[in-house]
């Protein structure tokens, strides 16, 4: 089921959390105006409060962890503010008739901003300069010797959805050549020379100076970047990941860095979060990391509320909802 019809008043719950820390009175008014007449719109400031009041809820804006799902028997539709849906696709949700919508097309830009920022911090020695502080002036010559220019290099994008396309646009703006792999091969777009099927992934890896992950976490992508994949990459290639850490075998990544096969890694995500202080990734000067912050933007909440309101209107007319997630595929 990929659509929902709201024929009468609905019980709507807005759950605040990491990706929707607050909702203004104006935004609540917009939700009430978009909802069917006489609908109830409530806000739960904590997940505990949401669980305690979810018995009659039909529509949720926010996260849907398993404990909330378990106490919401009337639930019909969830708009989940999450770039990746993997944590909410437990078997019971997948088997249910609940419609799940999300942020497709809304978050790729700021994820790519972080990805490209980390790439620049790595290639232009920005991270090294910040780490060294005043000592950087004494290391200036050594830093200049290893700076990398992006123009003319090839970026291979793995997963050509919203995040992958946004990375590609930024790479093209920096004068890079871009190729991509996706589960569905397609014609060139967003300045990309080719969009190949995933069975050509090794070919993409061998041709790329920078490999950027834009794929969601699914059964097919979990552990995709293992020792064999890293070995297939160009010697000295750079690796960028801002989507899900579990796509990468971190031991294989550490090994590829340790032997010098990889030139560096730019990461916003890790298989274990928080990444333990004694994890080997912290020991490499050619690894730059942020603590899973790429998904943040001051416009993220408002954009999702706008989509939610549009979908409330569509749910009353029977039109197709925006951002529907295929619960079996995971995106």
Where in this protein do the model-derived segments appear?
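N-terminal Rossmann-fold NAD(P) dinucleotide-binding loop
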Residues: 164-165
């Amino acid at each position: 089921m990929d659509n929902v019809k709201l024929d009468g008043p609905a019980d709507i719950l807005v759950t605040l959390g990491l990706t929707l820390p607050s909702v203004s009175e104006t935004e609540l008014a917009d939700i009430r105006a978009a909802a069917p007449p006489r609908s109830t719109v409530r806000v739960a400031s904590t997940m505990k409060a949401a669980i305690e009041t979810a018995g009659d809820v039909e529509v949720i804006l926010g996260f849907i962890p398993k404990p909330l799902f378990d106490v919401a028997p009337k639930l019909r539709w969830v708009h989940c503010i999450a770039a990746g849906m993997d944590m909410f696709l437990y078997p019971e949700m997948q088997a249910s008739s609940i419609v799940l919508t999300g942020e497709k097309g809304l978050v790729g830009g700021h994820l790519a901003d972080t990805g490209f920022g980390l790439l620049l911090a790595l290639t232009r020695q920005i991270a090294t300069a910040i780490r060294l502080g005043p000592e950087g002036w004494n290391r200036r010559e050594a830093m200049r010797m290893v700076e990398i220019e992006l123009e003319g290099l090839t970026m291979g994008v793995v997963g050509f959805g919203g995040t992958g396309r946004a990375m590609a646009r930024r790479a093209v703006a920096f004068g890079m050549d871009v190729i991509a792999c996706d589960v569905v091969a397609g014609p060139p777009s967003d300045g990309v020379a080719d969009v190949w099927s995933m069975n050509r992934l090794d070919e993409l890896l061998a041709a790329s100076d920078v490999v950027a992950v834009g794929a969601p976490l699914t059964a097919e992508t979990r552990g995709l970047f293992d020792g064999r994949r890293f070995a297939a990459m160009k010697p000295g290639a750079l690796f960028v990941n801002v989507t899900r850490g579990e796509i990468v075998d971190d031991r294989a990544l550490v090994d590829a860095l340790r032997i010098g096969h990889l030139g560096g890694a730019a990461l916003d995500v890790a298989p274990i979060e928080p990444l333990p202080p004694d994890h080997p990734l912290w020991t490499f000067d050619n690894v730059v990391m942020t603590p899973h912050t790429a998904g943040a933007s001051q416009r993220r909440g408002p954009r999702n509320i706008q989509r939610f309101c549009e979908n409330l209107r569509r749910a009353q007319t029977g039109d197709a909802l925006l951002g529907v997630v295929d619960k079996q595929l995971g995106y």
